[in-house]
Amino acid sequence: MLFETLSVIPEVFDPYLDASIMGRARRAGVFDFLSHDLRDWTHDRHRTVDDAPFGGGQGMLMKPAPVFEALDDLSSRGPRPHVVFFSPCGVPYDQRAAERLAREERVLLVCGRYEG
């Protein structure tokens, strides 16, 4: 099983996945993990991945272009991944969801940035 993340701070995952039970399972080959930097699919010199909401308001929104380009590129590398896009208003992650994901060959977790 391959777990992948698409994030603006991909280096945050390795310390957790190299330690304790997760680290032992990874070293034993139970699963593999790759983290991808969303900024690798940007085209401006500042590698911008977010922008202010067009209708106004507080906070920032993820720009769709880098996300779509990354998903297209990563999906072309091997088996098509099961994509999970985290959202504050999404479906709660529970045991049933964990069991469903465990049956997938490849899972790509798209990690946005949220205020607060």
Where in this protein do the model-derived segments appear?
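N-terminal nucleotide/polyanion-binding subdomain common to many enzyme families
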Residues: 1-78
